Amino acid sequence: MAAQVASGVGNLNLNSEGGAAAKNISAQGSPENEARESDGEYDDDQGAPELGNTTAAKKKKKKTKKKKKGTSKVQTEPPRVILSSLFPNNQYPEGEIIEYQNENAYRTTNEEKRHLDRMNNDFLAEYRYAAEVHRQVRQYSQKAIKPGQTLTEIAEGIEESVRALTGHPGLEEGDNLRGGIAFPTGVNLNHCAAHYTPNAGNKMVLQYEDVMKVDFGVHINGRIVDSAFTIAFDPVYDNLLAAVKDATNTGIKQAGIDVRMSDIGAAIQEAMESYEVEIKGTSYPVKAIRNLNGHTIGRYEIHGGKNGKSVPIVKGGDQTKMEEGEVYAIETFGSTGRGYVRDDMETSHYAKIPDAPNVPLRLSSAKNLLNVITKNFGTLPFCRRYLDRLGQDKYLLGLNNLVANGIVDAYPPLCDVKGSYTAQFEHTILLRPNVKEVISRGDDY
């Protein structure tokens, strides 16, 4: 999804020391208490031997109790163990740490910047919690997703895992605002690049020849981790996926404090468009989708709010610079089609506008639905399945009324030309004062 938010450093809770400590934490639960030592113990009822009887009385055999082994807590498949029980000290793994280069190289060793980075560690802990949930859920999903599954099964399986690992089922009022799913799970097939999740009754089935973008987010107290990957079963699409993964990693490498957006976009496009893919005997250049962007991420605002910034994936963008303390989703999209998307298909994604006008609503259904949205999602995006799950029904008229009045935004699926194939990879990065942290980085991508 796209975005804006310029979080000042004063609003950040960044602590590099907490992340380093996380490396030493094993994902185990507390061990059971060990059994007491019993060497040399005798039965109290055993009497002294009678005089002259040297054989009748015998010492009772020692009873050596076996020590109980501690039970290691590990994640289940599918993931259902709350993450805090695997990390009882609440110290979660750090992401990939990248030192700043060139004119910003001094930040890595500058004591003032290091001190600033150690402040407000709650911010970093919440981000790392969300990132570890994302890693564990997606790593299982990449193994479990197979042709023949419905898109609804795939999306809901991911969402149930996120709810379980964060400990926020989201059924009680306000629970989803404390943690859980940050936005609807995108399961975008082939020419559809973004913003598609199945509505109720959807029967679409994943096929072997499909290319599916899986885009989901996790948040803890509004600290959103946004990351996406692409699945293709047929190796014919390998170059398409490689191009987009390379482009995303190039964008991450280029990103940093005082770096211009236009420079990042140019580097991304150059990396991506150096690839081509052959499908059924025809070679297609991989094109960067020029009207899709990365974005800043704000608290409870996936696209950063009214002051958010966009990160282009083609050359020629504006001269805006990245700033210290900002959080970015670096995402790139490649296509075998035109490299341009448009609205298409049935809308499923919605979000309440942060600075929506105070409009008098005439429809009672719209008033009631707005109350449900505010108390359960705030400004986090939601989909129609989430309203169904909360027991809402016959809400479409009210929802459309909220959209028409400029209170809720609708995000239709974004698609290139039919017959084309698109791919996406995405990571969330934190521009900390002294280092750049790719918070969502994992062994998978």
From Swiss-Prot:
A divalent metal cation 2 binds at residues 226, 295, 331, 426. Residues 1-80 are annotated as: Disordered. Its cofactor is Co(2+); Zn(2+); Mn(2+); Fe(2+). Residues 57-71 have a biased composition (Basic residues). SUPFAM superfamilies: Creatinase/aminopeptidase (SSF55920), Winged helix' DNA-binding domain (SSF46785). It comes from the Eukaryota. Its EC number is 3.4.11.18. It is found in: Cytoplasm. One of its GO terms (molecular function) is initiator methionyl aminopeptidase activity. It is an enzyme of class 3 (hydrolase). A divalent metal cation 1 binds at residues 215, 226, 426. InterPro entries: Creatinase/aminopeptidase-like, Met_Aminopeptidase_Type2, Pept_M24, Pept_M24_MAP, Pept_M24A_MAP2, Pept_M24A_MAP2_BS, WH-like_DNA-bd_sf, WH_DNA-bd_sf. It holds the Pfam family Peptidase_M24. GO terms for biological process: proteolysis. The keyword Protease applies. Substrate binds at residues 195, 303. Keywords: Aminopeptidase, Cytoplasm, Hydrolase, Metal-binding, Protease. Transmembrane segments: none annotated. PANTHER family: METHIONINE AMINOPEPTIDASE 2 (PTHR45777:SF2). Belongs to the peptidase M24A family. Methionine aminopeptidase eukaryotic type 2 subfamily. Cotranslationally removes the N-terminal methionine from nascent proteins. The N-terminal methionine is often cleaved when the second residue in the primary sequence is small and uncharged (Met-Ala-, Cys, Gly, Pro, Ser, Thr, or Val). This is Methionine aminopeptidase 2.
